[in-house]
Amino acid sequence: MHSFYLRSCYLRSCYLENRLVRGKMELAGHHLDLADIKQDLYIVAAINDHIVPWTSSYMTIGHVPAPVRFVLSSGGHIAGIVNPPGPKAWYMTAETNPPTAQEWHQTATRHAGSWWEDWISWAAERAGPMVDPPPVGKRKYPVLGDGPGEYVRG
């Protein structure tokens, strides 16, 4: 499939028809339903996101039965996610998820730094013990060089 077709299907299904929230979404012949999500979720939204307003992202909480950690990041659609630790970075968290985004915002605490740090702690609580990574490279796919790769170094 071409990327235009995929993008068109995504926008039509998720934005215009809101199929995912309504439990009517299909992907590659599989029915997708937010109500089927059981594992803990970490949802990040950006306060200045002009494409997905954070208040809309917050509404996800009402559609999943799973425990949710909702985090509001400084920045916009891209900068809110690619938000490395630094003097301008901040994020907000709350201990509970009240019914509305406005109530959440009133009870949330603002933290200096990147939401990445919060996510690392959250993920560590749910992860197993650290293990050594598997060896890289195979006979058919030999190692080309050390990471991150020549293309990154320019």
Task: State where each predicted segment sits.
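Mg2+-dependent phosphoryl-transfer active-site scaffold
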Residues: 2-5, 61, 66-67
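Short beta-strand/loop motif that positions the catalytic acidic residue
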Residues: 43-45, 49
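Short hydrophobic alpha-helical runs that function as membrane-insertion/retention elements
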Residues: 68-72
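Histidine-bearing beta->alpha loop at or near hydrolase active sites
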Residues: 48, 73-98, 102-103, 120, ...
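Glycine-/small-residue-rich active-site loops that bind phosphorylated ligands and cofactors
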Residues: 11, 49-52
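Alpha/beta-hydrolase
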Residues: 1-35, 39, 105, 110-154
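Short alpha-helix in the alpha/beta-hydrolase fold that links the catalytic acid
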Residues: 53-63, 74
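Intrinsically disordered, low-complexity regulatory segments
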Residues: 62, 85-88, 144-145, 152
